[in-house]
Amino acid sequence: MKKLIHFLKPYRVLIVVVLIFTFLQTLGTLYIPTLTANIVNNGVVKGDIDYIVKTGLMMMIVAGITALSAVLVCKVSANLSSGFCRDIREAVFIKSQDLSINDFNNIGTASMITRSTSDITLIGQSVFMFIQLVLPAPIITVSGLFLAYSIDKAMTIIIVVVMFLFMLSAFLVGKKLIKLFKMMQIKMDNMNRVLREVVTGVRVIRAFNRSRFEKKRFDRTAIDYSETAISINKIFAVLMPIVMLIMNLGIVSIIWFGGMRVSNGNMEIGHIMALVEYCILILFYLIMGVMVFMYIPRAGACADRVNQILDIEPE
């Protein structure tokens, strides 16, 4: 993947724009729970209607800026990733024109088609998702923990424990998924190769009455691919309930122990709401970040396959 990074150089300005608006988006996302806590503690509890209205208007402004920043990040990220894919495809096409027959045969027509289409698309999608979901994750996590710590040091431990359990679950599941993603790319190549052979040799197949045999051959490759894809989806299906269980246990713990601290006069009600929001936000962005990182090994395998073409020295 590192060898393809130089294709991002023409988009340095767009990358800076994305970083600026991503920072604004994360700041707004984290500031809203703080305003919610202030409304409850200083407005609802004290019955101060003016404070509620003023803070509510501030929340609307912050929400508007956050939404606008999110839209701009999405739009600029889409332009960046699509331009990145276009440049790689152009480089692969130019390189393919210089390859000898032997070089082309070594790669294979089916594999060349896959690398020029779906592989590059996957690389572009991984760049898009990285910008959208991974970039905000460390900012949200660090800032969220800092804000939670500023509210209550003891309650922050619950969020840290929830994060640890989630990361442990994601690590164990991710090890299995990385292997399956690599297998799936190889099986897609096989399926494309068999399909191309059937399409290009359709006259010969019909002449020798081999249609049934070729159908069975294609079915075997399709079933092989589908079994791997189903295995991946089964693992994702197991991961999400585990994540939701960990998150809900964290929320229940915050409400339970927070309620005890409120009754003892060590915390205000609004702070419980803020801590719950911080926990949800941190876990949400961690979940999205882990999903992308599980996707990246597949994109890395695609990048290696594209680099094989770009690194060939023509005979």
Predicted regions and their residues:
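Hydrophobic alpha-helical transmembrane segments of ABC transporter permease domains
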Residues: I20, G28, I32, L57, ...
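Juxtamembrane helix-loop junctions of ABC transporter transmembrane domains
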Residues: I20-F21, G28-N41, V62-T109, I113, ...
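Alpha-helical transmembrane segments of multipass membrane proteins
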Residues: Q25, T29, V62, T66-A70, ...
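Transmembrane helix-loop junction
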Residues: N38, N42, Y149, K175, ...
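Helix-loop-helix
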Residues: D48, I52, L147-V161, S231-R305, ...
